[in-house]
Amino acid sequence: MCQDCKKTYYITTAIAYASGKPHIGNTYEIILADSIARYKREQGYDVFFQTGTDEHGQKIEEKAEAAGVTPQEFVDKAAAEIKRIWDLMNTSYDKFIRTTDQDHEAQVQKIFKKLYDQGDIYKGYYEGLYCTPCESFFTESQLVDGKCPDCGREVKPAKEEAYFFRMSKYAPRLIEYINEHPEFIQPVSRKNEMMNNFLLPGLQDLCVSRTTFSWGIPVDFDPKHVTYVWLDALTNYITGIGYDCDGSSTDQFKKYWPADLHLIGKDIIRFHTIYWPIFLMALDVPLPKQVFGHPWLLQGDGKMSKSKGNVLYADTLVDFFGVDAVRYFVLHEMPFDNDGVISWELMVERMNSDLANILGNLVNRTISMSNKYFDGVVSDKGACGEVDEDLKKVVLEEVKKADAKMEQLRVADAMTEIFNIFRRCNKYIDETTPWTLAKDESQKDRLATVLYNLTEAIAIGASLLYSFMPETSEKILAQIHTGKRELSRMDTFGLYPSGQRVTDKPEILFARMDIKEVLEKVEAMHGAEAAADRNQAGGEEGASGSAEDSGIDLEAKAEITYDDFAKLQFQVGEIIKCEAVPKSKKLLCSQVKIGSQVRQILSGIKAYYSPEEMVGKKVMVVTNLKPAKLAGMVSEGMILCAEDAEGSLALMTPEKSMPAGAEIC
C-alpha cells in the first residue's frame, strides 16, 4: 500500500521533565508507547511517534544554579541522558521534541498572544498556596492534610502578578464532549475521577504565567512574565508536528492531527484531560481522540525513590538482563489499570521461566531436533492428526486474541496471549514426543510434520513478538531462516516454506540465572554506590543529611529488630540560622535548636530550599548520630527529608506546632 494511502496513527508520550536520569518507572512509558507504535505499523498504519523533554520551570532553574551551570547547559545534559536511555531501550520514536527548540518557543509565544487577544487570557494577581516542585497554586480546600495534593510536600503562601486563562468559559463544553465521547479518557476510572473531582464541582481560572523565575518562554508583549509550564509543555503535541496558530500549519500537522493517543502517567491525567482540551477548544483545534493514563510501575510496595534505595535504572537492568528482557519485564508486569510491581527476584523468575524456558528452550530444542533428524531441513509431509489441528487452532486463536487486546491497549494481556503460543508448542512437544518418533523409520514423515508445525508456530509467534521484543523476534526468525510475517497473513497456518533449512548452530536466546548470584551482585553494586557517595561526601560536593546524599540505602539493608530501631532518637528541631556551605553545590549549614541545645547540622537540600526559607522551620531530626565531618565541617545530626521519584526533596515537618526538643515516637 502506498504511504499516502495508509491510515495515520499519531501517538505521543508525556515529555519527560529534564531534571535528571529517568528510572525504569519513567522508562516504562516510552517502552509501552513503542510497543503500541510498532504494532500499529504492523497493522499497516502510517505511524508518527513523538516523545521528548520538558525543559523549563523554576525547579530546573534552581537545580542548574545548585550545579553551577546555566539552565540551558543543565537541560542539554539532561535531555541527552534521557534520549540515550530511550535509544538504549530500542524505542522507535519519529521525533524527539525539546521545549527549548526555537520553533516550539516561537509558537508558544504566538499561542499565548492569540489567546490573550481573543480574551481567553487576562492579567491579574494570584494569591494562594504554592508548591514549588510542582509549580502549582492550590486553594486551601484542594490540599490534602495541609500539603500539596499532587506530591505531598509543603505549600507556602504566595502572591504575584500573573496572566490567567478563563477555564470556566469552556468547562460546560468539555463536560458535554466527555459525555459524548466515552473513549476520550481511559481507563474509565480516570474519567470518573476527572468528572467528579474537578469538572462537576467547577473550574477556577488557571494561572498561565510566572514572574518569580526567568527560565521559561517569555510572554513577548510583557517580558517580565514567562509562560507557565502547562501552556508550554502541553502544546508540544501540536508544535512538534508543525502547528501554526496563524493558520499556516504544515502538511504534517494536517496529516496526523488529531492525535490518536496521548499516553501519559496517571498522575498528570488532569492536565491532559482538562487543561489541554480546553486550550485546544480555545484555539479551535480538534481534540485528541484518546488520553490513556497508565498506572505506575512500583519497586516492592512503593513508588521508586532514590532515598529508599529502590530505584532501578534501565541501563543497570540491561547490564544484568539485556534490552529485550527488560522490555518484557515492564510490559508483562503492568496491568491495564492497576499499578504493577517489579523486583530483582521477579525479574530473575521471569527470565528463567518465561524467557529461558518457555521461549528460549523451545526455539533451541526445535532447531536442534531439525538438525539432528533432518540435517536442518524443515518439511511439511502432511502427516497430521488431531493434536496437530488443535495446535493450529490455538495458534491462530491466540493471534486474534492478542490483536483484540492491543486494540484495547491491554499490552500485558496481549503478551500473555503471544506466550500462550509458545506454551502450546511446548505442550505439543510433550504430546508428540519427537524423540520417540525418531526411533521408528515408519514415523519419519510424522516426525517431519511435527517439526514443521513447531517451526511454523514459532515463526508466527516470533513475528507477533516483534512489537514488544524486536531484537529477540529478529534473532528467532533469522535462526529459522525466514522473514517477519505480516500481521494480515497470520490468519493462515502453514506459510513457512517447506524444504527450508534452519541454522545449524542455534543461539541461546536467554540464559538461566541464579537468583542468589544476582542478589549478591546487586548487593555489591549498592555497596559500591554507597562507598562512592561516602567518598564524595568529603570532597568538594560535600554531603547531605538526607538519606540520598549520605549514601544510606534503606531498601538494600537487612531488616532490623525493634530494639535496634529503638536505639535511634528523633526530636523536633527549630532552625534558627542557616547558611550555604562555601564551595558546595548541595549543602546548607543549619543551626538547629533542640531543647536547650543548638546543634550544627549539614543537609544536601540547597537545590530545594534557600537559607532564608529554612529559618524558622520545625523539622524532624535524628539526634543521637555520631558527629560526622562533611565538606570540612562537623554535622551533629540528620534532618529528615522525603524524596519523590524525580529526586526532589522536601523537609519532614510535624503536622501541628510542637516545641523544639519534643521527642518523636
What function would you assign to each model-found segment?
Residues 2-78, 97-112, 117, 134, ...:
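N-terminal catalytic cores of NTP/NDP-binding nucleotidyl/phosphoryl-transfer enzymes
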Residues 2-51, 103-107, 157-372, 414-418:
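Structured secondary-structure scaffolds
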Residues 79-94:
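A glycine-rich helix N-cap at a beta->alpha junction
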Residues 118-171, 175:
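Cys/His-rich short segments
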Residues 123, 346-384, 394-502, 622:
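Helix-rich, typically C-terminal accessory recognition domains appended to large enzymatic cores
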Residues 473-564:
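Intrinsic disorder at enzyme termini
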Residues 536-665:
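Phosphate-backbone binding interfaces of nucleic-acid-interacting proteins
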